[in-house]
């Protein structure tokens, strides 16, 4: 027997074909959400308060300090928040201290700071009753970046940018004349030496002393001449910078100094964030820049005078590691003192080394490091600016390297906690202005923190973020996998990110650093491709927001691959060589081969085993969760795998789903972490279990009650239904399944079913990927799903009186009220179809002025029907089903309703949808199709043992699409069904062809895994053997019931008066320009005329046509389409004098053209009568003529006789 058994949870064993030992379990799959929010509550929120506070008034006599905060219990439980359309949030109380510096008085007070949305255990938020997710954002990291560009003459120029988290950008660039310029905040450029002089190093000698003598420096110094001898060089530089930043304003050195301090050195205006300081220190640090360079002068220990490194030594990694403590200490540190007129007058500490130029061994190049400022320094320092300039100058000498902005070392993730912190900071900074003004205006003696703090800006910022930010999304709740994928999504869009239109191919493309961090496969098709990604299965965020992936450390001395796990970011990984997870190992953990496949800085090739530093932990660390659920992924083309991963997220939860026979082993973990199942929180024993709740008694005697949700409506209108898995007496451990969620079976993800599938054509019904299906799948409810829709009706106070929910509805027969209760609300369990009343409601309507007598009669007889109109809630067009639940909210019961609303009724209608022609089906390999025919079971082809096939697919759908995984799955699935087992074939480590054939043989199938099929209609065998097996097929959310639509009389667009479009608007079908051409081509003038008039926007024409049809009268001639009037008005609005004239050149009002249509009536009967009349008249005339002729002839004869 190939493979080995693996237990997944307590309910499922699978035969696994994996050969690679898993040394690390998958992390919790939603930790990116939960960990980030926890960090925000633990210290993120505190940091934001500390950033903005303390706040002083303008005279600096009062100061408001932050002391601490406390989050109280949420007002509603999760379930209550859902029912009441409320948010699941907790009140937050902040303690402030107000200090009067003149009197020394201190007032401490706790201030209510609004309700803050709290994340649920599932990583979601409930906002206004709807479950939402904050998608993590992928943004460019703050730091310093260097780039190169080639000009039209082929000359390479360099550029650099310091990008802060917030604040002004500082750029450097060189031109074709080798002069280096700087730009501050995208303004006009100035020579970089001007900025150096403004920083207090004004002499040319000082500049050469700092940067060394290079062509770029020399050219720039020559360009930057002293123009005004009255000013010092520093003052002149300051004024020049001020002129660039504030053109047209009077320039002084003092104002320029304060402007530059505010732009770069004020922590309130300029913030690198922890990550920016980390990236700058990493980039400008001398350790990374000295690597593999030849030192030009000996390195001497400043304390002992000992020579650490001789001149001419190549600084290899081992040499640098040997003097690392000195490099981090005071080695080669030089203190430069700026002059007194400088922007910042503190001494500047730099680390300076001289190395041999890589391009010219006779030249010496100076490398300046920023001497590693402390992590707490969140602004840029003069040392950073000088070190950046040094790196820039070094690039032209061949030292250092330019950055790739798509490298994941330069892109970081802002998860929910950071996005929220930014929002709170925004609100607090708006509040700050307000507080300052109140402190200055009001009397200091009586002021308290409560009086000067207005929390509205903060609560508004948070509310706006959750309600309308691009990153706050309604949770995709089609099935548990789509929930999980949504929580792990990474978006490059959103505020501070990219926009769809400006994102090029490079940003969207797969980058080598995505390996183990972002999935190369799972991304949407369409305009967002590559901008929205998914975290890989083992991906994890470090404290700076960079994605890390785990590797097994290789002991370089012994060559043993240890079980020690090291998490590396993309930057760190670039320094090492990493072997693939499927490299063969010996028993002792050493590599079996001398040469192994590995990666180093994106180069995939064979490397000697003795230079490998790390090894992948698992083959599935490359891909995301949905992709890791595709068996035989390695046999599929990536485009189809992308479709397969995306379509699993669109699977509809079925009534009784089955886990796949052929899985990947990922199904258990995905179901467990998705948040849709009920998981035991503690160890214990089940003491009570039914469909609604499970009670577990813990060992310490306390009781846990788990509530099971039955048929709740999910965000996407599917039934969210949980099923109890445990029985009384079962012992459960923490983390065990207590109940399956939707689309789960026995603790595993179960998106579809395991039908018997044959690859064969049948009467042409599976042309173009169509699917032929057996009636068994309909009859046995194999692909039946339940859908829930919510309808609501509210009564409001109107000017004419309150609306009322009642059973007494004007002009409605008793038959329509049979299922309403005495209040006028539908009963639970009633079957309803479109147009049925769900909630009877009447609204007062405006009265005509009645005479006194009429009013008296009204008052006496209470004739209600004339003063109210029917505004009942009815089942909308195209819907039907059974009433599942009714919820009533009233002010009397203490429910919170919007102002003006007295009562709110919600009706839930459940609809059972069997599979039908037009529904979309798919496998897991991107093989999708539409059901084209449902064939009776007796007509379906059958196997030699008499089993009829369930589904027939077109064999032509496989070769050109190159998703061969489906064929492998088919054969292995048939073997699993025959053997009565479930199989796990993990991605990139699954069943080999030998495993596949040995399992097929074990199941007693034929050696080609094909079989003879018999035609169900004739009983004859088909000519050729057919591939038949079991394939996992899912029903997708694109169902024909949601798409089929027909319009009778419906709404029209206000301006053009043409019918609206789309099913939601009960719209019509668009008869467009090309369709008009078709009718013109055939000369179908009458059809064309009515399509362009009655059926579209001829207002009078269509009214009269409707009237004529209902009364059985002839249809009048059409009038002028409204769109012609719109065109005329539009031309007139452009100032063109356009008028319509008749034959006599008299102007005709457009409205007049429709007048007198009734005279030109065409009536078929009249035509017949007219014809008959004309024929009779013609006949009479003919007879009269004949008679006249006869008379004349007779007269002539008589005359002749008389003669």
From Swiss-Prot:
Name this polypeptide is given: DNA-directed RNA polymerase subunit beta
GO biological process terms, semicolon-separated: DNA-templated transcription
InterPro entries given in the database record: DNA-dir_RNA_pol_bsu_ext_1_sf, DNA-dir_RNA_pol_bsu_external_1, DNA-dir_RNA_pol_su2, DNA-dir_RNAP_su2_dom, DNA-dir_RNAP_su2_hyb_sf, RNA_pol_bsu_bac, RNA_pol_bsu_CS, RNA_pol_bsu_protrusion
Biased segments, Basic and acidic residues type: 1174-1195
One GO cellular component term noted in the UniProt record for this chain: DNA-directed RNA polymerase complex
Keyword RNA-binding attributed: no
PANTHER family: DNA-DIRECTED RNA POLYMERASE I SUBUNIT 2
Gene from which the chain derives: rpoB
EC number, as in UniProt: 2.7.7.6
Highest rank taxon of the organism: Bacteria
Description of how the protein assembles with itself and partners: The RNAP catalytic core consists of 2 alpha, 1 beta, 1 beta' and 1 omega subunit. When a sigma factor is associated with the core the holoenzyme is formed, which can initiate transcription.
């Amino acid at each position: 027997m190939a493979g080995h058994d693996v237990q997944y949870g307590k309910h499922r064993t699978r035969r696994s074909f994996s050969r690679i030992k898993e040394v690390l379990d998958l992390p919790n799959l939603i930790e990116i959400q939960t960990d980030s929010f926890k960090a925000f509550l633990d210290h993120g929120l505190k940091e934001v308060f500390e950033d903005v506070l303390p706040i002083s008034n303008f005279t600096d006599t009062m100061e408001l300090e932050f002391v601490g905060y406390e989050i109280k219990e949420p007002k509603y439980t999760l379930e209550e928040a859902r029912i009441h359309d409320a948010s699941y949030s907790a009140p937050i109380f902040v303690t402030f201290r107000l200090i009067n510096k003149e009197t020394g008085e201190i007032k401490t007070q706790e201030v209510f700071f609004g309700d803050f949305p709290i994340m649920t255990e599932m990583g979601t938020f409930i906002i206004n009753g709807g479950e939402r997710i904050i998608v993590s954002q992928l943004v460019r990291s703050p730091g310093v970046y260097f780039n190169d560009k080639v000009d039209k003459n082929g000359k390479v120029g360099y550029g650099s940018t310091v990008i802060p988290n917030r604040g002004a950008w500082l750029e450097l660039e060189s031109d074709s004349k080798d002069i280096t310029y700087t730009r501050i905040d995208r303004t006009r450029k100035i020579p970089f030496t001007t900025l150096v002089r403004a920083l207090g190093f004004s002499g040319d000698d000082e500049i050469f002393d700092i940067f060394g003598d290079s062509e770029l420096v020399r050219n720039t110094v020559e360009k930057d001449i002293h123009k005004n001898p009255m000013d010092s060089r520093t003052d002149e530089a300051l004024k020049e910078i001020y002129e660039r930043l504030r053109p047209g304003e009077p320039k002084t050195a003092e104002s320029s100094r304060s402007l530059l301090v505010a732009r770069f050195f004020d922590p309130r205006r300029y913030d690198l964030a922890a990550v920016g300081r980390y990236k700058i220190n990493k980039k400008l640090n001398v350790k990374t820049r000295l690597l593999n360079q030849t030192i030009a002068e000996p390195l001497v220990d400043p304390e002992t005078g000992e020579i650490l490194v001789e001149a001419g030594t190549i600084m290899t990694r081992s040499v640098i590691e040997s003097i690392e403590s000195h490099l981090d200490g005071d080695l080669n540190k030089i203190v430069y003192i700026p002059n007194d007129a400088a922007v910042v007058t503190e001494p500047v500490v730099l680390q300076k080394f001289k190395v041999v130029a890589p391009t010219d061994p006779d030249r010496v190049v100076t490398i300046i490091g920023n001497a590693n400022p402390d992590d707490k320094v969140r602004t840029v320092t003069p040392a950073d600016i000088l070190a950046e300039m040094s790196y820039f100058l070094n690039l032209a000498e061949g030292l250092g390297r330019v950055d790739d902005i798509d490298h994941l070392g330069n892109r970081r993730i802002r998860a929910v906690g950071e996005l929220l912190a930014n929002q709170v900071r925004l609100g607090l900074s708006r509040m700050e202005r307000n507080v300052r003004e109140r402190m200055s205006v009001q009397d200091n003696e009586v002021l308290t923190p409560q009086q000067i703090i207005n929390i509205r800006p903060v609560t508004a910022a948070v509310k706006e973020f959750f309600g309308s930010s691009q990153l706050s999304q309604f949770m995709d709740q089609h099935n548990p996998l789509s929930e999980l994928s949504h929580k792990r999504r990474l978006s490059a869009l959103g505020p501070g990110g990219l926009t769809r239109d400006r994102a090029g191919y490079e940003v969207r493309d797969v980058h080598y650093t995505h390996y183990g961090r972002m999935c190369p496969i799972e991304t949407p098709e369409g305009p967002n491709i590559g901008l929205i990604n998914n975290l890989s299965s083992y991906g994890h965020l470090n404290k700076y927001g960079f994605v890390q992936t785990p590797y097994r450390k290789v002991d370089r001395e012994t060559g043993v691959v240890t079980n020690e796990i090291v998490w590396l970011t993309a930057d760190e990984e670039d320094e090492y060589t990493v072997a693939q997870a499927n490299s063969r190992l010996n028993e002792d953990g050493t590599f079996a081969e001398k040469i192994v496949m590995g990666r180093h800085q994106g180069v995939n090739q064979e490397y000697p085993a003795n230079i490998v530093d790390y090894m992948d932990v698992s083959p599935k660390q490359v891909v995301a969760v949905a992709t890791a659920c595709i068996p035989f992924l390695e046999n599929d083309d990536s485009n189809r795998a992308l479709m397969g991963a995306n379509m699993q997220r669109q699977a509809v939860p079925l009534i009784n789903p089955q886990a796949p026979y052929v899985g990947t082993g990922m199904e258990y973990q995905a179901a467990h972490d998705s948040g849709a199942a009920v998981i035991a929180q503690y160890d214990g024993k089940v003491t009570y279990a039914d469909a609604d709740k499970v009670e577990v008694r813990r060992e310490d005697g306390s009781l846990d009650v788990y509530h099971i949700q039955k048929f709740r409506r999910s965000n996407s209108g599917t039934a969210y239904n949980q099923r109890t898995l445990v029985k009384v007496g079962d012992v459960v451990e923490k983390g065990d399944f207590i109940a399956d969620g939707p689309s789960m079976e026995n603790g595993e993800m179960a998106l579809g079913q395991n039908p018997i599938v044959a690859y064969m054509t049948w009467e042409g019904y599976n042309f173009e990927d169509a699917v032929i299906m057996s009636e068994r799948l309909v009859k046995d409810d194999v692909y039946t799903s339940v859908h829930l829709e919510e309808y609501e009706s509210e009564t409001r106070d109107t000017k004419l009186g309150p609306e009322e929910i009642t059973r007494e509805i004007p002009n409605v027969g008793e038959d329509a009220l049979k299922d309403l209760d005495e209040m006028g609300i539908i009963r639970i369990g009633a079957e309803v179809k479109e147009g049925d009343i769900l909630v009877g409601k009447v609204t007062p309507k405006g009265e005509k002025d009645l005479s006194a007598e009429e009013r008296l009669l009204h008052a006496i007889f209470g004739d209600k029907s004339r003063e109210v109109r029917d505004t009942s809630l009815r089942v909308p067009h195209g819907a039907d089903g059974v009433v599942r639940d009714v919820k009533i909210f009233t002010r009397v019961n203490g429910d919170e309703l919007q102002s003006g609303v007295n009562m709110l009724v919600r009706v839930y209608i459940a609809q059972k949808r069997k599979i039908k022609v037009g529904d979309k089906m798919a496998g897991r390999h991107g093989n999708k199709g539409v059901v084209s025919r449902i064939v009776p079971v007796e007509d379906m082809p059958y196997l030699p043992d008499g089993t009829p096939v369930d589904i027939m697919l077109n064999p032509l759908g496989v070769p050109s699409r190159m998703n061969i995984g489906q064929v492998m799955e088919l054969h292995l699935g048939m073997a699993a069904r025959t053997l009565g087992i479930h199989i796990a074939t993990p991605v990139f480590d699954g069943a080999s062809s030998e495993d596949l054939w040995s399992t097929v043989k074990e199941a007693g199938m034929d050696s080609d895994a094909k079989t003879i099929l018999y035609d169900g209609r004739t009983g004859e065998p088909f000519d050729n053997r057919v591939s038949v097996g079991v394939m996992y097929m899912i029903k997708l959310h694109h169902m024909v019931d949601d798409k089929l639509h027909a319009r009778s009389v419906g709404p029209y667009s206000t301006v053009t008066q043409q019918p609206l479009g789309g099913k939601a608007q009960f719209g019509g079908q668009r008869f467009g320009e090309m369709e008009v051409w078709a009718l013109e081509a055939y000369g179908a003038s009458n059809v064309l005329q009515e399509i362009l008039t009655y059926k579209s926007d001829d207002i009078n024409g269509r009214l009269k046509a409707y009237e004529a049809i209902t009364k059985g009268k002839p249809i009048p001639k059409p009038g002028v389409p409204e769109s012609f009037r719109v065109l005329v008005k539009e031309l007139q609005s452009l100032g063109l004098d356009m008028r319509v004239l008749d034959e006599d050149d008299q102007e005709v009002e457009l409205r007049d053209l429709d007048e007198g249509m009734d005279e030109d009536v065409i009536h078929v009967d009249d035509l017949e009568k007219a014809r008959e009349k004309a024929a009779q008249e013609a006949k009479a005339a003919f007879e009269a003529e004949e008679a006249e002729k006869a008379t004349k002839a007779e007269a002539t004869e008589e005359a002749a006789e008389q003669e």
